[in-house]
Regions:
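Anionic-ligand binding patches
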Residues: 2-4, 11-18, 22-209
Length: 209
């Protein structure tokens, strides 16, 4: 089966392609479609699953092929609703933040609460045809909980500002200081959650054929 992953991010596509390799799926991304006109999508859902559904419906209706989309949100324990990022990790009070602005904002939030414990919640929505749709936002897809602090790591990487403030709970290290093996543990757990979702969906789909 040829399946479209609704992303233009090659790193995300490669990671998912590797994880789903044993399922007999030929995974392609948006950039593989060449000059095919793609829909404009307004991601205004209140949860990652709502946004994933909006995206997958738009792609399926426009491209008429099996497709899935993912979305994520950042959620902290024990914070006021107004301080909960959710799906608006980079947008605060309607403003899209730069890396530096994000670092300042979340450092101040961590200072306000004396440190924060958070996790990324991930969702996926899959449409195989007009009659077969599968959605999930399961705990198995969540990142491991981590600590967010108010003191930034001296190093910064473009596009990953929150890693400057994030502490791995297993090791007590900033994310930037994790070695490759340590950093891979959480990613593998998240990928396993997605693999289980696709295994269940494909098994159910083939039973109904």
């Amino acid at each position: 089966m040829k399946l479209l992953y609704g992303t233009g991010n090659p790193a995300k596509l490669d990671a998912m392609r590797h994880r789903l390799a044993g399922l007999g799926i030929e995974l392609i991304g948006l950039k593989d479609l060449g000059g095919v006109k793609q829909p404009e999508i307004i991601e205004d859902g209140k949860t990652p699953l709502e946004n994933a559904r909006k995206k997958v419906e738009a792609y399926f209706n426009a491209l008429h092929m099996p497709v899935f989309s993912c979305d994520s949100g950042l959620y902290f324990d024990n914070v006021a609703e107004d301080d909960q990022p959710g799906v608006h990790v980079r947008t605060v009070n309607g403003k899209y933040l730069s890396d530096e602005e994000m670092t300042v904002h979340y450092a101040a939030l961590a200072e306000k609460y004396g440190g924060l414990t958070g996790r990324y919640k991930n969702a996926v929505s899959l449409i195989l045809d007009a009659d077969h749709r599968y959605d999930a936002m399961d705990p198995s897809m969540e990142s491991a909980p981590f600590r967010m602090v108010s003191t930034p790591h001296p190093m910064s990487k473009k596009g990953f500002p929150l890693d400057r403030l994030s502490i791995d709970l297993r090791t007590g290290k900033y994310y930037y200081d994790l070695n490759e093996q340590e950093a891979a543990l959480d990613q593998l757990a998240v990928e396993d959650g997605f693999l289980q979702f696709f295994e269940r969906a494909m098994e159910e789909y083939h039973k109904m054929e």
